[in-house]
């Protein structure tokens, strides 16, 4: 999938959400994530890594999954587009009923690890194997 398609899906979406994971810390892209969310006015939830996005920001809806809060989980479940950035989408995020995870959403996952992108649990509609630094460079040129 090319980055232009991601841009178009974000623009078309009525209820998008960014789900950011530990990959943001590993790739040292907190600043890029913050700019991307602000520039596009996108709701954001985080996985286990509660330190990757400021919890005082108006676009932050909390954590998602079994360790998350109600609002964070609602935002994901009722989204029509989930942009997963650097998250494994493990069982604590998706629950044991992973087929119901964001069931009405188009899911785009950006991860450097092909094994995480190709797990047989979550339905990922668009898989982008790419370092998050490169992803943010490319997407920010388009949006």
Describe the function of each predicted region:
Residues 2-3, 40-45, 102-109:
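Short, functional N-terminal and low-complexity linear motifs
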